[in-house]
A protein has these predicted regions:
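Bacterial N-terminal signal peptides
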Residues: 7-14
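Positively charged n-region of N-terminal signal peptides that target proteins for export
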Residues: 1-4
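Aromatic (Trp/Tyr) and acidic
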Residues: 118-208, 248-272, 286-326, 370-373, ...
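Hydrophobic, small-residue-rich alpha-helical packing segments that form membrane-like cores
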Residues: 336-439, 446-450
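Solvent-exposed beta-strand/loop surfaces of large extracellular or lumenal domains
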Residues: 660-685, 705-713
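Beta-rich interaction/scaffold domains
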Residues: 20-114, 817-970
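C-terminal beta-rich recognition modules with glycine/proline-rich loops and embedded aromatic residues
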Residues: 460, 539-548, 553-641, 677, ...
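Extended, well-ordered alpha-helical scaffold segments
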Residues: 136-137, 144, 211-230, 327-348, ...
């Protein structure tokens, strides 16, 4: 009877909605007024509180119109904007149809003397250690954790040691070759072993099964013992020098200039590990680390593949072991190995490298070892979190002199070309390799704990804020094909992404956000939260990326993770990565799922912050108190109980941004907080807590929309080079609390174009199912016949983003300050500035007599497309007012935006560069299935096509695949 009544009410709601639209419009927006230090672009909020005509309110995203590089450089120029200058920045609340570009807002900016406020270098709070917090119950969290641990202990530890023994001349008998990106013919080898060590350590801290902990402990000990055995082979006394042979002695400049990087060369290099230098520990000879000093390019066959990236993974693994295992001897040995390798890095970079940032690039590269150039190279200069690990080492170990060397080494990984603009709040993120740069920022922030230099804190804070406002998708991820695109262009980037399935036709490719980026953004967010634990924006984002992309990135049916995450239209998660060495995301993936609780609680001497709501038991050893949080996950209500101990402290509970209605806190049955401000913390002041004290939190999930900042107006067609034009429309995702909701059965953008009521009354929340394990507490909602489930639970052919037709209130009026009937060309102006800048870069390179670097700033085909669209757009920009309609202006702006966002750096191949390869592949597929050589060539060619489509392939890979196919087709 109850079910029939619910259906009747639902049917009646639909009938009423069809008869009359319940309009809701923005009635009020909080004022935006900021002070900015002279020489910096303003820090503008990425979200503002709006109040609607029905009295309700929420945070909405803002797109500010100062994001072009030229505009930001002007804002940060003290000659143009000296102290005392006041100016305005225009923007729009996205997803609103009051005007074509959204609801207009204005920020008042005042330029002042001084600097931004910077916290003390000692964080206000630290997360409770992983070993002191356990996840409880039978839910998706514990299911994923146990799946990960079981996979981890099934992996042969000797396989992880193969490359080390091979590199140091030890017998490899009984040690199976590694595979994936740690294979003997992959120069990133060692990265997977580093992730493996981190995962062992984190799993050890999280594991609830003593038998499994014993296996983890045994494997950790074997890794540490054998790595130290390898490292000790580099302890070589040199009588002539009167000291040990060190990193600075390895490869003198004359030798370095002649050093080659082919596989035959590396076979030679590994024959004498005594030359590597005291303390060198890596799965590949030391030549790999020093070739980057000659600015050798990313090329697995002939040169390098991110030398210091793999070093970082191994350092991080050793540090994680040292800080998580309960065996003191093993912990000390792991830390000693890491310290000795950290000092090798210091020795090499201190004595053999330098920084020169002025002059032309050929001048900057005239001598080996200019770190300005080294760390600014695509992938070859990818260093992971070297700075973070070295900074952590300086905190954990060493004499005063060694600590100073380690923090100096950490800051040797500063990238001035990237850091300097960020420190001024100028967006240096655009077009960079995403996962190359996120951990560099985390490292800078970690070094701030020791050096106290505001430069490092500022650049980290500015970077994080830019990500939130300009680059993130609804699930919390970033990037497309491993790259950051233009700011505020997520929808265009998503809708124009294409790939080849092995033939010559191009197809939409809805796999975008690299999982490594989610892992590293979560880590950066956790670090920032420690300095400002009362600012709920950090843990709001952490909850978003954890609840969606991270938890959704492991296959609950069998252990597999994803590289690029499924985002957009009719997207399927590309499962794979069954080992830490499979790819970079196989490595971060095996860590992700054994540490969900690492940021659940932050503490200091007198306060605990409850940052995440999940079923956990927290042992606050400093206070002698055990707190048990009892809830389902995802949680709309939770109970925190003092299970053991007593103590005096305050408790702060996060009010999520989405908790706009009904958030209530009770202490021992008495209401202590209600009508709380979203995106804040509620404090229960310092009191004497005792066993069985109970805090109850009610936080009903609300329905809301998460819009992309740009409208959807074009998508690739299935014929090569074709595209389909659409009327510009805001595109967004349905949200249920922190969860992105997705549905199946949507095949194209026409089907993904939907009507949505302004007050969201046609979105019906259905609550949660029962279930256990991976399917426990599964929420759903419905909208016009489609049932939506959380993104983390969807696998195949799911759609997250929809073109949403939300009627604007015809009676709504803008405030007088924002009312305007003029044609808005602001976005077209910003795009033309980008096109102008890129054209100038390309022409400057063309004019060089000696091409340094050897490739142009922008790849040929994409550059030509941009110039063609810019030529079409410029006349509309120059035309008198009224000659062109807003629709015509927006159309050319959209086409130019699409052209800009599909450009690639000049060192990367484009899809057009695979024409011959794809033709050969089609022919090769006609050969007999029993031709093993052909099958290997076909498999490799398919992999290359995927890599190039994703943006991570290289011309040498295309050439190698082409040659292999030609050989089998003879």
């Amino acid at each position: 009877m109850k079910k029939i009544l619910l259906l009747s009410v639902f049917s009646l709601t639909l009938l009423v909605a069809s008869a009359a639209i319940s309009y809701r419009s923005i009635a009020k927006v909080e004022r935006v007024s900021v002070e900015t230090p002279v020489g910096c672009a303003p820090r503008l909020p990425y979200q503002v509180w709006v109040t609607y005509s029905d009295g309700k309110g929420e945070f909405r995203q803002v797109k500010w119109l100062n994001s072009s590089e030229a505009t930001e450089k002007a804002e940060s120029n003290p000659t143009i904007n000296p102290v005392g200058t006041a100016y305005q920045v225009r923007g729009f609340i996205i997803g609103d149809n009051t005007t074509a570009n959204g609801y207009p807002v204005t920020a008042e900016v005042q330029v002042v003397e001084g600097a931004w406020p910077v916290p003390n270098r000692i964080p206000v709070a630290e997360p409770l250690p992983l070993s002191q917090v356990s996840i409880d119950g039978n839910n998706r969290l514990t299911w994923n954790r146990d799946l990960d641990i079981d996979q981890l202990i099934s992996l042969p530890v000797k396989q992880q040691l193969y490359n080390y023994r091979d590199t140091y001349g030890l017998s490899t008998e009984g040690y199976p070759e590694s595979d994936g990106w740690d294979s003997p013919t992959t120069k990133l080898k060692g990265h997977g072993s580093g992730h493996y060590m981190s995962a062992l350590a984190l799993a050890f801290a999280s594991c609830q099964d003593e038998g499994k902990k014993d296996i983890l402990r045994k494997n950790i000990k074997m890794m540490v013992d054998e790595l130290r055995q390898c490292q000790e082979l580099t302890f070589v006394w040199d009588e002539k020098l009167g000291r040990y042979w060190e990193a600075r002695d390895f490869a003198p400049e004359e030798e370095l200039r002649q050093m080659q990087g082919t596989w035959s060369d590396f076979d030679r290099y590994k024959k004498d590990c005594r030359k590597y230098g005291y303390g060198y520990l890596n799965a590949i000879p030391a030549q790999h680390c020093v070739l980057i000093e000659m600015y050798r390019a990313y090329n697995n066959e002939s040169w390098v593949w991110a030398p210091y990236y793999s070093v970082h993974k191994q350092l991080a693994g050793l540090i994680d072991i040292a800080t998580n295992i309960d065996d003191k001897e093993v912990a000390e040995k792991a830390l000693l190995i890491a310290k000795d390798m950290g000092l090798w890095v210091w020795n090499r970079l201190h004595y053999r490298t330098y920084v020169k940032s002025d002059g032309r690039q050929d001048e900057r590269r005239a001598r080996p070892g200019n770190r300005y150039e080294m760390w600014n190279m695509y992938i070859a200069g990818e260093v992971g979190g070297m700075a973070e690990s070295l900074a952590r080492l300086s905190e954990l170990t060493g004499t005063a002199e060694e600590k100073a060397h380690l923090i100096e080494a950490a800051n040797c990984f500063d990238s001035p070309a990237f850091f300097d603009p960020l420190a001024k709040n100028v967006d240096a993120i655009r077009t960079r390799h995403a996962n190359q740069h996120i951990p560099m920022v985390t490292g800078a922030l970690r070094s701030f704990r020791t050096n106290g230099n505001a430069y490092y804190y500022d650049l980290a804070q500015n970077f994080w804020t830019m990500i939130q406002g300009r680059y993130r998708y609804a699930m919390g991820g970033v990037g497309n094909g491993e790259m950051f695109r233009q700011p505020y262009s997520q929808i265009t980037s998503m809708c124009t992404n294409v790939t080849s399935w092995g033939g010559r036709e191009l197809h939409p490719e809805p796999t975008l956000n690299e999982t490594c980026c989610a892992y590293n953004l979560a880590k950066l967010t956790k670090e920032l939260n420690g300095f400002n634990p009362d600012d709920a924006r950090y843990m709001d984002y952490y909850e978003r990326v954890l609840s969606n992309q991270i938890i959704g990135s492991v296959n609950p049916n069998r252990y597999q993770t994803v590289y690029q995450y499924a985002v957009g239209l009719n997207a399927s998660k590309p499962w794979g990565n069954e080992t830490p060495q499979a790819t970079c995301c196989g490595g971060t993936g095996v860590e992700n799922h054994v540490k969900y609780q690492e940021a659940a609680y932050f503490v200091n001497d007198n306060t605990i912050w409850v940052a995440l709501y999940m079923p956990t038991t927290a042992h606050w050893e400093q206070k002698g108190v055990t707190i048990r949080q009892e809830c389902q996950w995802p949680a709309e209500q939770t109970t925190l109980r003092i299970a053991k101990g007593k103590g005096q402290f305050a408790m702060k509970l996060r009010v999520p941004y989405w908790a706009t209605e009904g958030f209530t806190v009770k202490l021992n049955g008495k209401v202590v907080a209600k009508k709380c401000k979203p995106c804040s913390y509620v404090e229960i002041p310092v009191r004497r807590w005792k066993e069985n004290d109970v805090v109850e939190v009610v936080m009903p999930f609300t329905k809301h929309l998460d819009f992309g900042p740009d409208k959807m107006e074009t998508a690739p067609a299935y014929e090569k080079g074709g595209k389909t034009e659409y009327a510009p429309m805001w595109t967004g995702a349905f949200m249920y609390g922190p969860m992105v909701m997705a549905t199946t059965g949507i095949r194209n953008w026409d089907e993904a174009t939907i009507d949505v009521a302004p007050d969201l009354s046609d979105i019906v929340l259905m609550g949660a199912s029962e279930g256990k394990g991976a399917d426990a507490h599964l929420y759903t909602l419905t909208h016009h016949g489609h049932t939506f489930m959380p993104d983390y639970a969807g696998n195949d052919h799911v759609t997250h983003y929809f073109r949403m037709n939300i009627p604007a209130d015809p009676n709504a009026q803008l405030p007088a300050s924002n009312a305007s009937s003029a044609i808005d060309k602001s976005q077209l102006r910003e795009l033309l500035l980008i096109a102008k800048s890129r054209n100038e870069e390309q022409q400057a390179w063309n004019a060089l007599m000696v091409k340094v670097p050897e490739y142009a700033p922008w790849a040929t085909h994409g550059f030509s497309r941009m110039m063609e669209q810019a030529a079409k757009a410029q006349p509309l920009m120059d035309a008198d007012e009224g000659r062109y309609s807003q629709e015509e202006i927006d159309k050319v702006a959209g086409a130019l935006n699409a052209a800009i966002n599909t450009m690639r750096p000049g060192n990367l191949p484009e899809l057009e560069d695979m024409e011959e390869l794809q033709q050969l592949l089609e022919k090769a597929k006609l050969l007999s299935d029993t031709n093993e050589k052909a099958n290997r060539a076909i498999s490799y060619a398919g992999m290359v096509i995927r890599y190039v489509s994703d943006g991570s392939g290289t011309m040498d890979m295309i050439q190698r695949a082409t040659n292999q196919l030609k050989e089998v087709l003879k």
